[in-house]
């Protein structure tokens, strides 16, 4: 199967919003309300090419079906006036998981290229959904990322 990624277009928003809702419902984030208007706003920011927000979608050549998306940003580091890039959401739908290594590689490479262009000194990608296996971490390590810590949560 031939897969490619491209920047988000306004006509992609309904599909990406459905994927984001699925991700919300199938992750630890389901304890939080889902604010579709907020998510749509954050996704839409990437439609401006000068925005510090980035979204790519993955598609199969010859199809309009979105297989997954990567939503990231560039911001100034807490300690510095230098920029870093991070991710807000990364999702490949279960139906397309057999293509996940290729889809993720293309999405991460596109994000890294965009982050470089936007002056990021570092790229940080993580997983906190509790909806992933060990494969994603291993994939990121093969892409040159290192494990730098952990995230602990406590519900209320």
Could you say what each language-model-derived stretch is?
Residues 57, 65-75:
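Conserved beta-strand in the GNAT
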Residues 76-87, 146-147:
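A conserved beta-turn-beta hairpin within the catalytic core of GNAT-like acetyltransferases
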Residues 107, 123-135:
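Conserved beta-strand-loop-alpha-helix junction that forms the acyl-donor binding cleft
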